[in-house]
């Protein structure tokens, strides 16, 4: 995820030291030895993965917070809940490894998916799990459509192919944060906001994946003039319909799995709100892409690209937008926009 290099030996040492420290602390509580090792292993494994994708000292924050979250859940819930949480961890491992093998994710993307999956599967359970799995599985499959056509855009878009950790964080991170906030301060609205953030991610992803299949050039959302396929801020009829379909699917799944099947959480009004928020966020994403997202020009081939480095790793020159505002940050802003929109209207 960053410039720091991590090794298997280092991660193994991290896991073992964390296991010993957590087990020693839990042993003082008088819990059974089996439970101590069980809980310590879960905490140590989660903390190790948090450390593996951290960089530039951020592990000083991610490791203790991640370990505290898992430990708090295990110590404040029943053994049955802890068993279900363990199944969630196992499920997160399977999803991350399988996605890595299928080249849906890079190694850092798989690690980030495990962290996000543990939180969603283990704490949120099925009501939170099914929407994010729907987004991830269907979006990953869509990314494989028109592979040859999309390969031609590799020089323009910042990232392509297997999704890395930042892409996972950009699309699923806001939802994961909302779930954690809902865990700390329980309220039905958190699920609604969670669904809205995923509707935004689904609408944007489906709009992009389906839109690139269009035989006609997209048009700028600002000027409505034709722009090359893959240009940030470009929209098309088929891409917009793809965004609407993605938001509709996510809203529908959220309605079907709403906690306790309570209409008070996601009824018809909430369903329409999630659907509309997803579409609005997708358009907001395109607007940011056309106006504020960083655009660079390669000094070698003169192509305009989202990449900060292009031909043979040569550093590109910024020609528009804000240098720090890349596609991942635009996606996070779009998810935040969807959440804010729901808060205002609801």
Where are these regions (language model features)?
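Interhelical loop and helix-boundary elements at the membrane-water interface
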Residues: 1-73, 82-132, 136-345
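Positively charged, low-complexity intrinsically disordered leader regions
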Residues: 78-79
């Amino acid at each position: 995820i960053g410039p720091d290099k991590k090794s298997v030996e280092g991660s193994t040492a991290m896991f073992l030291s964390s296991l010993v420290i957590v087990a020693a602390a839990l042993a003082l509580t008088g819990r059974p030895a089996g439970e101590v090792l069980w809980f310590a292993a879960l905490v140590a494994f989660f903390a190790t993965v948090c450390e593996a994708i951290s960089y530039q000292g951020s592990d000083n924050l991610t490791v203790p917070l991640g370990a505290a979250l898992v430990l708090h859940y295990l110590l404040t819930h029943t053994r049955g809940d802890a068993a279900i949480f363990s199944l969630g961890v196992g499920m997160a491992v399977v999803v991350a490894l399988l996605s890595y093998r299928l080249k849906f994710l890079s190694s850092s993307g798989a690690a980030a998916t495990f962290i996000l999956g543990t939180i969603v599967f283990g704490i949120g359970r099925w009501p939170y799990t099914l929407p994010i799995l729907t987004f991830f599985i269907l979006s990953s499959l869509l990314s494989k459509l028109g592979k040859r056509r999309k390969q031609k855009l590799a020089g323009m878009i910042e990232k392509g192919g297997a999704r890395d950790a930042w892409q996972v964080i950009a699309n699923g991170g806001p939802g994961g944060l909302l779930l954690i906030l809902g865990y700390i301060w329980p309220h039905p609205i958190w699920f609604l906001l969670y669904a809205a953030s995923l509707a935004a991610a689904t609408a944007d992803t489906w709009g992009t994946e389906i839109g690139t299949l269009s035989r006609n050039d997209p048009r700028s959302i600002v000027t409505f003039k034709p722009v090359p396929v893959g240009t940030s801020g470009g929209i098309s009829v088929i891409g917009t319909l793809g965004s609407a379909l993605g938001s509709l699917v996510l809203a529908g799944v959220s309605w079907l799995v709403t906690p306790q099947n309570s209409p008070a959480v996601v009824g018809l009004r909430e369903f329409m709100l999630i659907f509309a928020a997803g579409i609005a966020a997708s358009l907001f994403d395109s607007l940011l892409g056309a106006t504020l997202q960083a655009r660079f020009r390669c000094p070698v081939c003169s192509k305009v690209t989202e990449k900060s480095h292009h031909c043979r790793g040569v550093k590109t020159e910024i020609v528009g937008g804000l240098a720090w505002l890349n596609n991942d940050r635009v996606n996070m802003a779009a998810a935040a926009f969807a959440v804010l929109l729901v808060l205002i209207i609801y």
